[in-house]
Amino acid sequence: MIGAAESFEERLSVSSWDRRQGKLAVFGCIDEESGVFNREYLLFQLRENLSTFNRYRIPFSVLCIQVDQIDHFQSAHGIRAVDAIQHAVAQTLGNSLRPTDLLGRLSERTFLAVLTECKANEIESVAKRLTKMVSYTEIKWWGDKVSVTASFGGYCFGGGRHG
């Protein structure tokens, strides 16, 4: 299995994801709350992928990701817990993608993954793997370990839809 769920306790090593994010934070490309690419950078990269697809017909896919029942989670644990779990989910997703893929925060409650050279027949297995990784993600909140699930919808540029 590629990727890893995050349990946000002290980490000693810095992943390639963290190094890449650190470099781009200097240029204002990172969403401060989630630690992933911000909407502007995400949309820029999406336009670049569309341009490449139109020119060279290299397929790519996008996955729209939402944490399930976030309003219920907020009622039970508060807005700070929502921010913490969204950050944990974002880091888990980012660390579970290939180095050529990217993850960004599309809106307050939605992430978008751009999967390079991912064909229609591959997107479902990627979504299933990421769903599993998110389900293992947990945070400690007021002495409790809390976790969430996520829903995915996807589209492949080069043919096919999922979700």
Predicted regions and their residues:
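Regulatory sensory/coupling modules that transmit signals to nucleotide-handling catalytic cores
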Residues: 1-22, 125, 132, 136-138, ...
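Conserved long alpha-helical elements within nucleotide-processing catalytic cores of c-di-GMP signaling
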Residues: 25, 31, 35-50, 54-62, ...
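Residue-level detector of beta-strand structural context in well-folded domains
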Residues: 101-102, 137
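A short pre-motif secondary-structure segment
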Residues: 102-105, 146
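Catalytic strand-loop-helix junctions within cyclic-nucleotide turnover domains
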Residues: 114-123, 142-145, 150-163
